[in-house]
């Protein structure tokens, strides 16, 4: 674990549901923990602005960084821009317990540097096709938690949900996963429980 607040990296391809997950986690945890968010976009701060519009956290607890080029570089090879944003948030809010770091959309090979994230969540999209879990990739196989999002779309895109979960189980082995519909809140309780358990947040998140 890094020093200071727990850092959770949220990765996945474009459109998989990373910002939706970030928003839902803020809604679920902001009343129980002191938390903040860092978003990564290639040339804009659109994801940060979306979170501000949703008012899931005060604006001064959200930082948007523009990575330029390949978004995976800013979360793996050279995480300095994200580390600077984290340092800024920690100075502004010394009581921080949790920081969510949302990566820019990338491919199945994107991973977070251990210098940047204590835990990683990887989000994939059911609508991207039946074979996504079978394609493996570090995001699918090595993340601390895999979230298979938009399972409600399976019948509309020719995906067999039973086979999708079986393939996910094979790809993950002993590592946990959640079948989710993030926009509708399905699976959020399981993801929150994972963060509390694996991130050592039990006492901090206990109801007052």
UniProtKB/Swiss-Prot annotation:
Gene Ontology molecular function: GTP binding; GTPase activity; nickel cation binding
Binding site for GTP: 12-19
Subcellular location: Cytoplasm
Family: Belongs to the SIMIBI class G3E GTPase family. UreG subfamily.
Protein's name in the database: Urease accessory protein UreG
InterPro entries assigned to the protein according to its UniProt record, in alphabetical order: CobW/HypB/UreG_nucleotide-bd (IPR003495), P-loop_NTPase (IPR027417), UreG (IPR004400)
PANTHER family linked: UREASE ACCESSORY PROTEIN G
Keyword Repressor part of the UniProt annotation: no
Keywords carried by this UniProt record: Chaperone, Cytoplasm, GTP-binding, Nickel insertion, Nucleotide-binding
Coiled coil: none
Keyword Transmembrane among record annotations: no
GO annotation (BP), single: urea catabolic process
Source superkingdom: Bacteria
Binding partners and assembly: Homodimer. UreD, UreF and UreG form a complex that acts as a GTP-hydrolysis-dependent molecular chaperone, activating the urease apoprotein by helping to assemble the nickel containing metallocenter of UreC. The UreE protein probably delivers the nickel.
Pfam family, one: cobW
Protein purpose: Facilitates the functional incorporation of the urease nickel metallocenter. This process requires GTP hydrolysis, probably effectuated by UreG.
Cellular component, GO annotation: cytoplasm
């Amino acid at each position: 674990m890094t020093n200071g607040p727990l850092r959770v990296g949220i990765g996945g391809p474009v459109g998989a549901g990373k910002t939706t997950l970030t928003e839902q986690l803020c809604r679920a945890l902001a009343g129980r923990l002191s938390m903040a968010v860092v978003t990564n976009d290639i040339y804009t701060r659109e994801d940060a602005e979306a979170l501000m519009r949703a008012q899931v956290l005060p604006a001064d607890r959200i930082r948007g960084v523009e990575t330029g080029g390949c978004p995976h570089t800013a979360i793996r090879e050279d995480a300095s821009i994200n580390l600077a944003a984290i340092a800024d948030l920690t100075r502004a809010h010394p009581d921080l317990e949790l920081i969510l770091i949302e990566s820019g959309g990338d491919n199945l090979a994107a991973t977070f540097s251990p210098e940047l994230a204590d835990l990683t969540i990887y989000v994939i999209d059911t609508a991207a096709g039946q074979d996504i879990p079978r394609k493996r990739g570090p995001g699918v196989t090595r993340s601390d938690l895999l979230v298979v999002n938009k399972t409600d779309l399976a019948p509309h895109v020719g995906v067999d949900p039973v086979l999708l979960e079986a393939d996910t189980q094979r790809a993950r082995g002993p590592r946990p996963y959640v079948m989710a519909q993030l926009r509708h809140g399905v699976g959020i309780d399981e993801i929150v429980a994972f963060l509390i358990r694996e991130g050592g947040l039990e006492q901090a998140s206990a109801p007052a």
